[in-house]
Regions:
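Acidic (Asp/Glu)-rich catalytic clusters
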Residues: 36, 58-68, 102-106, 136, ...
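Conserved, mostly hydrophobic/aromatic
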Residues: 1, 27, 42, 57, ...
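Short, well-ordered amphipathic alpha-helical segments that serve as non-catalytic structural scaffolds
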Residues: 30, 91-102, 243
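Active-site groove signature of glycoside hydrolases
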Residues: 102-121
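N-terminal binding-site loop/beta-alpha segment at the start of enzyme catalytic domains
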Residues: 1-67
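Active-site mouth loops of central-metabolism enzymes
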Residues: 11-25, 80-95
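Beta/alpha (TIM)-barrel catalytic core signal, keyed to glycine-rich beta->alpha loops juxtaposed to Asp/Glu
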Residues: 117-315
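A short, structured active-site edge motif that brings together acidic residues
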Residues: 66-79, 113
Length: 316
């Protein structure tokens, strides 16, 4: 389960970087529902709600020792104003950030720690990964990886013993064949962020509803890619309309169909859909019972979408 949304608001200047409408009581119910329906991987970050997402995870999973917690570092944030204050990835900060995350999730061990700077140059990232390697040796984290959409960045670190995971954007709108191929060749787990296109692929915006201000999706489309001024991008809305019926094959909801599209892409792909309610968490987890979309449906979707060539990598 992706835990960006439950963290609530945080900001980059005047631009919202978090989700609106999060309610702590319902967020806790969502986390419990996810667990009860078979979810075992929970993805968060030190910046989600200025650490609030991690604290909620710590509370909800206090007696769930086999829960897999993935967290991220790389941005400094003012906890009082919830303002992002800039990238930080020097070794001392990496250690400090991991310590703070451990306190917030109330554990002495985090399963996977990811660098949360998508397009950081490889040479600048090296010291951070050296530090993470030392933290693996110290038993503080289980392994580490990079949240990046750049295959070359992941490839540059894949030789490291503790580098286990690449988190990247991928969904029915934006395929990522180069990253998938690399991850499979190198034996890396793929954590898929934005598997539901920040909500567009749930179908709940098909009736014209929009996201209010104070939400990351109400910001400029060139920053988050799926919404323009609080409404789904017109081209994505058209694509959603075109494939909606195919996604619901076998009794799936549109959201479950979109997740099953990802499951059909390979056994090393692990979508991390977000949820702000228990109902959403249960629905998302229900995709596991359906399993991958049938091959014939996958072909029909590709024929309808007529994707352009992948093109050069870019941050998504």
């Amino acid at each position: 389960m992706g835990c960006w949304a439950i963290g609530g608001p945080f900001w980059f200047g005047e631009i919202a970087a978090g989700y609106s409408g999060a309610d702590d009581a319902e967020s806790l119910r969502a986390l419990h529902a996810a667990w009860d329906h078979g979810t075992r991987v929970f993805d968060t970050s030190a910046v989600y709600g200025a650490g609030h997402s991690e604290r909620l995870l710590g509370e909800a999973l206090a007696h769930r020792g086999d829960a897999v917690i993935v967290s991220k570092f790389g941005h400094s944030i003012d906890a009082t104003t919830r303002q992002l204050t800039g990238p930080r990835f020097d070794p001392a900060y990496v250690r400090w950030s991991v310590e703070q995350s451990l306190r917030r999730v109330d554990r002495d061990y985090i399963d996977v720690m990811l660098l949360h700077l998508n397009d950081l140059p490889v040479e600048d990232a090296e010291p951070a990964f050296e530090t993470l390697e030392a933290l693996v040796a110290a038993g503080v984290i289980g392994s580490y990886g990079w949240s990046t959409d750049f295959p070359a960045s992941a490839a540059a670190m894949a030789h490291r013993l503790g580098f286990s995971t690449v988190q990247h954007s991928m969904n029915l709108f934006f395929d990522a064949p180069s990253m998938c191929r690399l991850a499979t060749e190198r034996g890396m787990t793929q954590l898929i962020r934005s598997p539901l296109g920040m909500g567009v692929l749930t179908g709940k915006f098909d009736d014209g509803r929009y996201v209010p201000g104070g939400d990351v999706r109400a910001g400029p489309a060139d920053w988050q890619g799926y919404f323009d001024g609080g409404r789904p991008r017109a081209d994505l809305a058209r694509q959603m309309t075109a494939v909606r019926e195919l996604l619901t094959v076998g009794g799936r909801t549109p959201a479950q169909g979109a997740l099953c599209w990802l499951l059909a892409k390979g056994p090393d792909i692990l979508p991390i859909p977000g949820a702000k309610s228990a109902a959403q968490a249960a629905e998302n987890a229900g995709a596991m019972a359906f399993g991958p979309l049938p091959e014939t449906v996958m072909h029909e979707i590709e024929n309808l979408l007529q994707r352009p060539p992948e093109g050069p990598p870019r941050a998504r």
